[in-house]
């Protein structure tokens, strides 16, 4: 079995000089968690396998600040770095990779123009392109016979709807079908975030995580809802994820990455210590 990856996620807002890491619940009510470069250094030293930076302001004025944050981080950190947020052009990808990122994460731009995945994968390689999918449960299955219906923990049937613009806009697109299409177009990984779970500390959304892990051949990164090491264990054991992304439990010092990895190792999950 391949080693499972632990990936801290840093949601970076560029509303002040140098950027700031924040964390909210269901993408709102943001509270500050620290300087992105300092946090990245800490996670690197603590044994993180990779890092994800998401520019959640992702505005035109913010792009240069983000490039600066990436360059400063790449000087200090020597594990793979994925950067996402508002990336919608080949030139933006080129700038971010040149600044020191190893991968980029595309989300809204890919939903609006799926060929963007193929174009960027053809130019930079599938290993550089992560398709981020934000999704919400939708229990209206009667009017959606063409959707992939899953059974929730309590037995309720539901499908998962792709949402874009940081969770603010529903698309009517089925998350399972979209993930399969992203793989076909050349995405090297899927970063799956449950909007229902984001910031709730209630655990990953297992039904959708497991479904994508079973249906796709590329790695699935589970995201949204981690409150303790048990949730990460369940993401691997029940959700079959290849990697676990978490934010709050690391940013505010509740658990160290090393503690989480020891917990997983004791439960026979292969991790890099």
Swiss-Prot record:
Its EC number is 4.3.2.10. This is Imidazole glycerol phosphate synthase subunit HisF. It catalyses: 5-[(5-phospho-1-deoxy-D-ribulos-1-ylimino)methylamino]-1-(5-phospho-beta-D-ribosyl)imidazole-4-carboxamide + L-glutamine = D-erythro-1-(imidazol-4-yl)glycerol 3-phosphate + 5-amino-1-(5-phospho-beta-D-ribosyl)imidazole-4-carboxamide + L-glutamate + H(+). IGPS catalyzes the conversion of PRFAR and glutamine to IGP, AICAR and glutamate. The HisF subunit catalyzes the cyclization activity that produces IGP and AICAR from PRFAR using the ammonia provided by the HisH subunit. One of its GO terms (biological process) is L-histidine biosynthetic process. HAMAP family: HisF. It holds the Pfam family His_biosynth. InterPro entries: Aldolase_TIM (IPR013785), His_biosynth (IPR006062), HisF (IPR004651), IGPS_HisA/HisF (IPR050064), RibuloseP-bd_barrel (IPR011060). PANTHER family: IMIDAZOLE GLYCEROL PHOSPHATE SYNTHASE HISHF, IMIDAZOLE GLYCEROL PHOSPHATE SYNTHASE SUBUNIT HISF/H IGP SYNTHASE SUBUNIT HISF/H. One of its GO terms (molecular function) is imidazoleglycerol-phosphate synthase activity. Keywords: Amino-acid biosynthesis, Cytoplasm, Histidine biosynthesis, Lyase. Pathway: Amino-acid biosynthesis; L-histidine biosynthesis; L-histidine from 5-phospho-alpha-D-ribose 1-diphosphate: step 5/9. CDD domains: HisF. Heterodimer of HisH and HisF.
């Amino acid at each position: 079995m391949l080693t499972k990856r632990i990936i801290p996620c840093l949601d970076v807002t560029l509303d002040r000089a140098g950027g700031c890491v924040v964390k909210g619940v269901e993408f709102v009510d943001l509270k500050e968690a620290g300087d992105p470069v300092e946090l990245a250094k800490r996670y690197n030293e603590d044994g993180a396998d990779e890092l994800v930076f998401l520019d959640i302001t992702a505005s035109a004025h913010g792009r240069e600040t983000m490039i600066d944050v990436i360059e400063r981080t790449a000087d200090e950190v020597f594990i793979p770095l994925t950067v996402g947020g508002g990336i919608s052009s080949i030139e933006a990808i080129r700038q971010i990779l040149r600044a020191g990122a190893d991968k980029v994460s595309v989300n809204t731009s890919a939903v609006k123009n799926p060929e963007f995945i193929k174009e960027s994968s053809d130019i930079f390689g599938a290993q550089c392109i992560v398709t981020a999918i934000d999704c919400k449960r939708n229990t209206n299955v009667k009017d959606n016979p063409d959707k992939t219906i899953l059974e929730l923990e309590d037995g309720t049937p539901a499908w998962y709807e792709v949402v874009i613009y940081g969770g603010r806009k529903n698309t009517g697109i089925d998350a399972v079908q979209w993930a399969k299409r992203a793989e076909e177009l050349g995405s090297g990984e899927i970063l799956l975030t449950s909007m229902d779970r984001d910031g709730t500390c209630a655990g990953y959304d297992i039904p959708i995580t497991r479904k994508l892990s079973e249906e796709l051949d590329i790695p699935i990164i589970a995201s949204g809802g981690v409150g303790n090491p048990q949730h990460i264990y369940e993401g691997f054991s029940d959700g079959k994820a290849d990697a676990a992304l978490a934010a709050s439990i690391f940013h505010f010092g509740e658990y160290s990455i090393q503690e989480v990895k020891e917990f997983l190792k004791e439960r026979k999950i292969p991790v890099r210590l």
